[in-house]
Amino acid sequence: MSALVYFSSSSENTHRFMQRLGLPATRIPLNERERIRVDEPYILVVPSYGGGGMAGAVPRQVIRFLNDEHNRARIRGVIASGNRNFGDAWGCAGDVIAQKCGVPWLYRFELMGTQRDIDHVRKGVNEFWRQQTRSA
C-alpha cells in the first residue's frame, strides 16, 4: 500500500480521524515555514474551509504543499472532510483539489468522521491501491 498525506488544523478533527483510521500517514505541518516532500504516490486527506464557498476552501498549507511540483506529481486521489452546515459546499476542498490535480475525489466525511466513515475509508483506500497496482 502507498501513502496517505493529510492536513489538520489546530481543531485536530482530521488528525483524530487519521489516528482512528490507523494507517501510515504523513501530516502536512501547520507551520507554513515547515515543508515536507513526499516521494511515493499518496492519497491526500484534507479539511474544507471557508464557511461554504469555494474561495478559501483549501487550506493555505495544502496549497503550498501542492504547489511543489514534486508533491503534486504523486497525488493519486483526495478525501475531504467538512461540515454539513456548508450545504452543497460540504467537503468542497476535495472537489477543488480533484479538479485542479486531475485525480478522483474518493470520499468525504463530516468533522471527525463516524466509525462507518473509518471502516469505509480503510476498505476503500486498500482497494484503491490494489487497483492502482493492477493497472500499473
Curated annotation (Swiss-Prot):
Report the superkingdom from the record. Answer: Bacteria
Please name the GO terms that the record assigns under molecular function.
Answer: FMN binding
Gene3D superfamilies, sorted: 3.40.50.360
By its UniProt entry, which SUPFAM superfamilies does this protein fall under? Flavoproteins (SSF52218)
Pfam family for this entry, one: Flavodoxin_NdrI
GO biological process annotations for this chain's record?
Answer: protein modification process
* InterPro entries (UniProt xref): Flavoprotein-like_sf (IPR029039), RNR_Ib_NrdI_bac (IPR020852), RNR_NrdI (IPR004465)
Write out the similarity annotation.
Belongs to the NrdI family.
The record, for PANTHER family, names: PROTEIN NRDI
**What role does this protein play?**
Probably involved in ribonucleotide reductase function.
Q: What is this protein called?
A: Protein NrdI
Organism expressing this protein natively = Salmonella arizonae (strain ATCC BAA-731 / CDC346-86 / RSK2980)
Q: Which gene encodes it?
A: nrdI
